[in-house]
């Protein structure tokens, strides 16, 4: 832990744990609006299985993308917990941004980007930027943070979700 943003966030959280901090009404309202937007996206009725290349899937194995596009009927049904997991991630992102703001950490908010690759355009929306670098908010266990997300090398060596490709796509766009 040595990045100034991380230090500021930990200080803010320490203050909160010791009843020494408050949240502005503006920040609380923004967190609520962000969660409302996430609910609208998750329960908006759009078919999330329609295939298209997007930043969130470009790092996945090519064979998985091929099957997603050409044989979607062979996919296993999504578990009933899928939408809840997506919602928890959206809530974590909304609260995290509120914490950053209250800790005095400057960050760039979500932005939609497009990357032209050959004849295709890949679209996506990244979570935030800190110090001009694209970053992605993840909800994960303490074990995951210590063992999976500890460094770029650790993440790249054992990740099956395409996080590295996703971040490279956002940063390149």
Where are these regions (language model features)?
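Metal-dependent nuclease catalytic cores that hydrolyze phosphodiester bonds in DNA/RNA
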Residues: 1-134, 141-157, 161
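An active-site-proximal "capping" alpha-helix that borders the catalytic cofactor pocket
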Residues: 163-173
